[in-house]
Amino acid sequence: MSYNCCSGNFSSRSCGGYLHYPASSCGFSYPSNQVYSTDLCSPSTCQLGSSLYRGCQQTCWEPTSCQTSYVESSPCQTSCYRPRTSLLCSPCQTTYSGSLGFGSSSCRSLGYGSRSCYSVGCGSSGFRSLGYGGCGFPSLGYGVGFCRPTYLASRSCQSSCYRPTCGSGFYY
């Protein structure tokens, strides 16, 4: 299934498969060939996910593994996405739980048109809730190197911080 999202396309190979985003969508520049996993099949199934691009407010996604990083466009800043609770992922050291609030006072731009939230005070010894400076990369990367998943943290910042781990490329 596919949906037109502004100037870009949103497509899903199959239920439980992968979502492939174009290099440019809604006027923003996104990493090409980045893979996002989902277990939501219908654009009307929006209860646990967040809206994606302008014009696709009913299209949601929910990460199912530690490989998943999120992108959000401007209309989605007040949306929340809730990762599956109690998932232990490698190379992360903790599970992710709770939800992220977009548009909150702790939002910071990732530098390519999307916004990311993190919990103030999160980031104790060796953990970061946002990837700025993590492994030497300022944000979710362009090109071959980026720090994978450092972008998930709950509002309360309890047991939901991520340890940044450098990757050599995007997941395909």
Curated annotation (Swiss-Prot):
Sequence repeat residue intervals: 46-55, 56-65, 66-75, 76-85, 92-101
Database matches in InterPro entries: Keratin_matx (IPR007659), KRTAP_PMG (IPR007951)
Stretches the record annotates as 5 X 10 AA approximate repeats: 46-101
GO CC terms, sorted: cytosol; keratin filament
Tissues expressing the protein: Weak expression seen in the late matrix and entire cortex area of the hair follicle.
Molecular functions per Gene Ontology: structural molecule activity
Alphabetic keyword roster: Keratin, Repeat
Signal sequence residues: none
One of the Pfam families matching this protein, by short name: PMG
Function field: In the hair cortex, hair keratin intermediate filaments are embedded in an interfilamentous matrix, consisting of hair keratin-associated proteins (KRTAP), which are essential for the formation of a rigid and resistant hair shaft through their extensive disulfide bond cross-linking with abundant cysteine residues of hair keratins. The matrix proteins include the high-sulfur and high-glycine-tyrosine keratins.
Subunit structure: Interacts with hair keratins.
Family, similarity comment: Belongs to the PMG family.
Annotated PANTHER family: KERATIN ASSOCIATED PROTEIN 3-3-RELATED, KERATIN-ASSOCIATED PROTEIN 26-1
Name of the featured protein: Keratin-associated protein 13-1
Organism, scientific name: Homo sapiens (Human)
Gene name of this polypeptide: KRTAP13-1
